[in-house]
Amino acid sequence: MELLVKINKKLEQRRAILNTIIQNVGIQNRILKSAQILAECLKLGGKIITAGNGGSASQSEHFSSEMMGRLKNSRTPFPSLSLSSNASLLTCIGNDFGFERIFSRQIEGIGTTKDVFIAFTTSCKSRNIIEALNVCKNSNIKSIPVGGINLS
């Protein structure tokens, strides 16, 4: 029974988050703006670049996989790649330039002004994510941070 209580508590927490989003026009507008940025990127022939650390790396890879795969409907694949996927490249850059540069260095190499960078993060404090967002800003590459935000 104790496990069921824990499960219900987690479900209630998720419901509270969804209710906050439903009731907050500001959050809804940020979601809409993100969708518009992604649509414009694809319309212009850009690609969606994603990255994250730990579990967020898995989210990054999953998102990019769904963009290249089917998601819900058969369609032309949307150009997308996860910067978290290549262990050889991550360790090469980490060794040569420092772990904080593992994503920004890749963006410098492949990013264009048509692209969008999605940073999956729970804390919004990881140095490598911050560095990547700074490179995007300085290179006029649009970016969307996902997660780790205060919903109020």
Where are these regions (language model features)?
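Glycine-rich phosphate-binding loops that contact phosphosugars or nucleotide phosphates
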Residues: 56, 61-152
